[in-house]
Amino acid sequence: MLQPLTDPLVPDAVQRWSASDFAKNGRFIQDLAGPIFALLAPKPGERILDLGCGDGTLTAEIEAAGADVLGIDNSDELLAVARMKGLSVKKADAHALDYVQEFDAVFSNAALHWMRGPDLIVGGVARALRPGGRFVGEFGGHGNIAAIATAMRAVVKGRGGNPARAVRWYFPTVEEYGTLLSGHGFAVHEIVLVPRLTPLKVDMQGWLRTFCRFFFDQFEEPERSEVLAEMVDLLKPSLCDSQGRWTIELVRLRFSAERRSGE
């Protein structure tokens, strides 16, 4: 039976994570992070906040560059993995950052689309940065995983639910996010959408179980398994080739902005 989703506009709507599933099905995220890491260009001695650090893979790379880095996330499971790597991390709600001019840069990779209160996020980042500090990030932009999001809406509608409540991600346009950054005192140096067809190293079921757990949690068994199978069937004609290889259509929003002095 379909259970009601919490309001998708509530900022603290939570995606539950499995550290083992993330390591198996989500490693492509870090593998594709080279361009955004280069845009951050961390320097020795800089104080950097990694917003949505997950299991700390990129946090460790920032630290290896000589920066003093703090990672924050809301997943106990992923933070436990990061702590095992000896990293400085803490559990925190990115919608309620309480730092004031403590960081030279704030970095975020593949996390901001999970945070449904972007105005709160950007405002908190602006306060956390020193004047001239950098906000560098990459996350899902407009059109990201469009086929998957459409299939989710179709499944919910077919079961009598509200398709408008089926998808919790925040995938803004360049214009929308650029305006948000400017409104919080940032000078935007770069902001682009980057289409990225990404072959999966796992099957679609594994990807959906890892990254759409919030969606399947609204169903009880055996319907949950039925919905997963229905999603795969809907997506197969568009995203799976004749050899059984799956590809997802990522669209990333990549940006670099600087907190203006005096803001």
Set out the residue ranges of the language-model regions.
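Class I SAM-dependent methyltransferase SAM/SAH-binding core
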Residues: L49, G54-L97
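Conserved class I S-adenosyl-L-methionine
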Residues: M1-E46, T57-E61, L78-V81, V136-R159
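A short glycine-rich, Lys/Arg-flanked "PGG" loop and its adjoining helix->strand segment in the class I
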Residues: D119-R134
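A short SAM/SAH-binding and catalytic strip from SAM-dependent methyltransferases
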Residues: A105-P118
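C-terminal helical/coil "lid" or tail adjacent to the Rossmann-like core of SAM-dependent
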Residues: H189-Q243
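Short alpha-helix
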Residues: Y170-H184
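A short acidic, Gly/Pro-enriched loop at the edge of an enzyme's catalytic core
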Residues: H95-V106
